[in-house]
């Protein structure tokens, strides 16, 4: 049932290319027709050669010329058919991969957080490639195989129904074997695909975090974990390949029986004058052409099981429930005044395990709101909710008096300038990374933003300055420099609201002071949310919210909270040893 559903989903993609499909089928039929006509010419030539009397070489020459033209035309027709099949396959693969990527872009972060990056990448790259190989083989060999079987059967019935009966009686054994193995291998290939995805995930983790792996001496344990998955993949692959490898020898054995039966029956018929030597030659050629597609189709069926198993995993991604759609009348947030309110907000990552309960917060335009507290208290979660990376379970969040669920996500998020604890840089130049939020920025604006964030100095010292290429992880740059680039992005856009999540945690104290000066200028008149463990970065905040277990337990500015001598004062003293 699941395979049928997968096939129906696939057919929806193929329908767009119905014209190419018809063209492919027409040239497949033409290729088969010309291929099947060739044995008749060969049989006629054999009869001319073995006939009593003088051999008519002129007639044989004409037959040979016909054969040459026919072979050339068959090759051309097959080339056009393959070209059509290639176009159908790779356009379909392009569409599926585009849909998978488009769905990935609108999936809730809950899905991304629940799956390893490598596993998602494996579905979109390795699984799609495997699917493409199976689909191409299916188009290339399945059409011609079926047409060849039908065509040769008709020709053999026309030539000698009795000998054809021998072929038809023995052949179903081959179909039974192929069908049995196909049912067995589908589940095995799906298991193999899943193990391959898990292995890709481990490699992605290890390559991306190799410094941490080596720093903690995790190499042996990482190797053990990889070997365990690698061994599981080997076993899955062996089981799948073992069963699939039985197909070809089994069908070849049955086909040999067919060929032997035709030889015996044909020889007996020729002895009694029921068939000429040339006709027997043609019949043997047809018998060979009739059985050959069964070998190919059995291989195609096995490959298709792998392709369908991979397609099933791809369609699982494409059909994942997307994030809550925006209402049809969603408003675009333009020129917000900076007021933000969280009203009776409750949220949980895991159902019935509340992280934040009945949370209230009111930020006035231009206020600097600092959020502090121990790890896991919900600080970063508040930021996720403000940006609507996650939706609240109950309550609501308002920006400028508007419920953010009634706003377009794009307009909401571009209203915030965000610097995260984990820096992210894309493959490209320094300049391309800075202008991500403002692609039309001038060189003067870029340099001004870099100077304001104190990034201009180190950028100028790079080999090609702002045109220096970097990799996605910012290879060659220090963690502090990478974070400075991320801060420069925000400096360039000058959004009405700011979110700074551990924004200076990777920068030395001297640079941090300069950054704080730049941020003070940037935050002037802008509502700012600052999440930090380093309390030195939030002394100038208008309001400091002290969180614990998803609740605000203290609230005030730096001085009043110290005077209260509560949890904040305890945190402050622990950091500054006073």
Regions found by a protein language model. Name each.
Residues 2, 326, 333-578:
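ABC-type nucleotide-binding domain
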Residues 5, 14, 46, 81, ...:
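Juxtamembrane loop-to-helix connectors within ABC transporter transmembrane domains
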Residues 11, 19-40, 63, 67, ...:
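Alpha-helical segments in transporter systems
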Residues 21-80, 158-162, 273-277:
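Transmembrane helix-loop-helix hairpins at lipid-water interfaces of multipass membrane proteins
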Residues 43, 73-76, 139-182, 234-281:
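A hydrophobic transmembrane-helix motif
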Residues 90, 98-122, 126-128, 201-225, ...:
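Short intracellular "coupling" helices and adjacent cytoplasmic loop segments at the cytosolic face
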Residues 109-110, 126-135, 139, 143, ...:
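An intracellular "coupling" helix at the cytosolic face of ABC transporter transmembrane type-1 domains
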Residues 218, 242, 259, 289-317:
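Cytosolic ends of transmembrane helices, especially the final helix of ABC transmembrane type-1 domains
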């Amino acid at each position: 049932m699941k395979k049928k559903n997968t096939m129906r989903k696939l057919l929806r993609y193929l329908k767009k290319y119905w014209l190419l499909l018809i063209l492919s089928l027409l040239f497949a039929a033409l290729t088969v027709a010309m291929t099947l006509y060739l044995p008749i010419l060969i049989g006629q030539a054999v009869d001319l050669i073995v006939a009593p009397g003088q051999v008519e070489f002129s007639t044989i020459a004409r037959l040979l010329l016909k054969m040459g033209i026919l072979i050339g035309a068959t090759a051309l027709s097959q080339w056009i058919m393959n070209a059509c099949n290639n176009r159908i396959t790779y356009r379909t693969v392009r569409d599926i991969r585009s849909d998978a990527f488009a769905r990935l872009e609108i999936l809730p972060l809950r899905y991304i957080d629940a799956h390893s990056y490598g596993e998602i990448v494996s579905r979109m790259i390795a699984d799609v490639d495997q699917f493409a190989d199976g689909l191409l083989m299916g188009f290339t060999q399945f059409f011609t195989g079926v047409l060849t079987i039908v065509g040769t059967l008709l020709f053999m019935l026309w030539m000698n129904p009795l000998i054809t009966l021998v072929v038809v009686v023995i052949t179903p054994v081959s179909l039974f074997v192929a069908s049995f193995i196909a049912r067995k291998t589908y589940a095995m290939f799906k298991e193999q695909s899943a193990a391959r995805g898990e292995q890709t995930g481990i490699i992605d983790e290890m390559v991306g975090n190799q410094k941490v792996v080596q720093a903690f001496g995790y190499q042996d344990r990482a190797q053990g974990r990889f070997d365990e998955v690698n061994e599981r993949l080997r076993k899955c692959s062996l089981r799948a390949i073992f069963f699939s490898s039985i197909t070809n020898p089994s069908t070849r054995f049955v086909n040999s029986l067919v060929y032997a039966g035709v030889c015996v029956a044909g020889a007996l018929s020729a002895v009694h004058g029921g068939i000429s030597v040339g006709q027997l030659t043609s019949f043997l050629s047809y018998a060979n052409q009739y059985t050959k597609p069964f070998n190919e189709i059995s291989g195609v069926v096995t490959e298709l099981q792998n392709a369908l198993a991979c397609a099933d995993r791809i369609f699982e991604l494409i059909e994942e429930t997307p994030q809550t759609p925006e209402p049809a009348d969603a408003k675009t947030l333009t020129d917000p005044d900076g007021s933000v309110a969280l009203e009776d907000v409750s949220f949980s990552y895991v159902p019935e395990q509340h992280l934040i309960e009945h949370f209230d917060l009111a930020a006035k335009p231009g206020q600097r709101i600092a959020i502090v507290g121990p790890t896991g208290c919900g600080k970063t979660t508040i930021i996720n909710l403000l940006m609507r990376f996650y939706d609240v379970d109950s309550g609501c969040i308002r920006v400028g008096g508007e419920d953010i669920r009634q706003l377009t996500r794009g307009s909401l998020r571009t209203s915030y300038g965000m610097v995260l604890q984990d820096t992210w840089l894309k493959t490209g130049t320094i300049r391309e990374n800075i202008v991500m939020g403002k692609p039309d920025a001038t060189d003067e604006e870029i340099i001004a933003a870099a100077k304001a964030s104190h990034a201009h100095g180190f950028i100028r010292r790079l080999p090609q300055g702002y045109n220096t290429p970097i990799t996605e992880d910012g290879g060659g740059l220090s963690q502090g420099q990478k974070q400075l680039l991320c801060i420069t992005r925000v400096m360039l856009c000058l959004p009405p609201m700011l979110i700074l999540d551990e924004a200076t945690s990777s920068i030395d104290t001297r640079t941090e002071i300069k950054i704080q000066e730049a941020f003070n200028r940037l935050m002037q008149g802008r509502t700012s949310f600052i999440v930090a463990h380093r309390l030195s970065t939030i002394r100038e905040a208008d309001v400091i919210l002290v969180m614990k277990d998803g609740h605000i337990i203290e609230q005030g500015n730096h001085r009043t909270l110290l005077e209260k001598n509560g949890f904040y004062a305890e945190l402050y003293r622990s950091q500054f040893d006073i």
